[in-house]
Amino acid sequence: MTFVIADRYELDAVIGSGGMSEVFAATDTLIGREVAVKMLRIDLAKDPNFRERFRREAQNSGRLSHSSIVAVFDTGEVDKDGTSVPYIVMERVQGRNLREVVTEDGVFTPVEAANILIPVCEALQASHDAGIIHRDVKPANIMITNTGGVKVMDFGIARAVNDSTSAMTQTSAVIGTAQYLSPEQARGKPADARSDIYATGCVMYELVTGKPPFEGESPFAVAYQHVQEDPTPPSDFIADLTPTSAVNVDAVVLTAMAKHPADRYQTASEMAADLGRLSRNAVSHAARAHVETEETPEEPETRFSTRTSTQVAPAAGVAAASTGSGSSSRKRGSRGLTALAIVLSLGVVGVAGAFTYDYFANSSSTATSAIPNVEGLPQQEALTELQAAGFVVNIVEEASADVAEGLVIRANPSVGSEIRQGATVTITVSTGREMINIPDVSGMTLEDAARALEDVGLILNQNVREETSDDVESGLVIDQNPEAGQEVVVGSSVSLTMSSGTESIRVPNLTGMNWSQAEQNLISMGFNPTASYLDSSEPEGEVLSVSSQGTELPKGSSITVEVSNGMLIQAPDLARMSTEQAISALRAAGWTAPDQSLIVGDPIHTAALVDQNKIGFQSPTPATLFRKDAQVQVRLFEFDLAALVQ
């Protein structure tokens, strides 16, 4: 049998389950959209703290809007077997998660893994910018869609598990998570954005090797290794790597997995940038910084960008700047990278020379330089950096909601690219936020409103509310926030409230109530009542029945109320009474007709002299209900000798 929640989401088959929830395929019947509905396990839903955390984290997830994040459309609670169970309505993604892909298709090459994890890092950066730490980055929470897209799931939901019970005491919920747990989380310390970066490094390790960096018989054993042990460099498990490629992939993975958060990439964007270099076989900043640190350990860093999250890539032959992860902390490095450094220092001519050959000597006749990282720099400073590196600079302008006016949004070719000196580099400089007036979408359908907002560069908030309305037809917009005409930044989100039509109200049972009171009650409820008076023996003005009683009708509906006029009385038994006695008996019963309305008909012949002029027939008959203003017909006995003879 079909199960519908919130009068909107029609649930179908279970498409996934985990230690804390079940996920159903579902349809949003309001707008005809396929969705997924995640429900908390009923035993966990009985914990008020757990339920509240789940609800709040779902709301946090709903704040995120990114193409690589599974969108959260709605949240709520539904009664199941007497327990209020929280649920989350999400975008339904058609595809497989990374764990399934690796199991079924095998490992990724480092370049393939980098291309998968770049959008993951971008999604994490969007989450971190919104103040949300994922806390449960793992292959099972990363989907590859049927069209090749990447979607990150379950933002913030793991926090509910951690708040309810220790991650290390609920084995069934953590065995998958423990393999991607950062050292600080394993020690019970708070997680931050760099904890997600550590987990992403663990995911990349698994993608390129086919196994997690640490394995053990229990979550405790795995967590211990995260804190105390260095992982085997992933290149040890990857065949057919050149020395430079091996160092490159090891540097990226092991930098992300550094034991101390200060030694990791400091932002997901920084890791995404290095993954981008890895994906195009350019030397990563992690590898470059490590080679230089080990080859010239006493040399100070030479130059820093004004942004601390990225390194300024120098021209060929010039010492590189430290990454924004911090100078002294990055020099500490993880022991895994120290091992790499030993290899590099022992084989300066071989491996380090290979870097020089592979990346800095692409042309025997033309000098090249790496494009320095000018993203986020003021225009003039970026111009100076690029000209000092030997490039011709072309400047274009573009509005941006994220980059302040006058700062560089991006470079083309991209930062870190090795190109010949004297080539042209185009930098795009922000003109600030582009503002636009919000269009009026009131009275539109949801589809038309979404299209109107999209046409001007605005985004429809997927959490669409519904309200009843006496004035606006069901399915049309009745309110928008921000209001129409307000000036906002292009790319802003607009929330809509849709009409569900006129409010429906249950018609009450008013039988036996006085009509005047019943009328007031119905009017106060929003109905338009009309009385229909019927002949009845009930007291005058008493309600006999109400049309559509017990059903729900739209507010403003007309209601017919049947009301007693009190005109029916019960006919008394007039047998063998005189007409005078009959009139008295009728009056006592409530008869209001004039005395002349007692109609005496043809006599009834009788041989009993005692019955002379007594009533022998009446209409209506005794106990019959009749109108109290109606005529009463009687026939009197008349003594007849002939009847005696007969």
UniProtKB/Swiss-Prot annotation:
Keywords: ATP-binding, Kinase, Nucleotide-binding, Repeat, Serine/threonine-protein kinase, Transferase. ATP binds at residues 15-23, 38. The active site is at residue 136. Residues 365-431, 432-500, 501-565, 570-638 form the PASTA domain. Residues 303-328 have a biased composition (Low complexity). It catalyses: L-seryl-[protein] + ATP = O-phospho-L-seryl-[protein] + ADP + H(+); L-threonyl-[protein] + ATP = O-phospho-L-threonyl-[protein] + ADP + H(+). The keyword Membrane does not apply. One of its GO terms (molecular function) is protein serine/threonine kinase activity. SUPFAM superfamilies: Protein kinase-like (PK-like). SMART domains: PASTA, S_TKc. Residues 9-278 form the Protein kinase domain. PROSITE patterns: PASTA (PS51178), PROTEIN_KINASE_ATP (PS00107), PROTEIN_KINASE_DOM (PS50011), PROTEIN_KINASE_ST (PS00108). Residues 283-332 are annotated as: Disordered. Signal peptide: none annotated. Its EC number is 2.7.11.1. NCBIfam families: PknB_PASTA_kin (NF033483). Belongs to the protein kinase superfamily. Ser/Thr protein kinase family. This is Probable serine/threonine-protein kinase PknB. The lineage of its organism: Bacteria, Bacillati, Actinomycetota, Actinomycetes, Mycobacteriales. The gene is pknB.
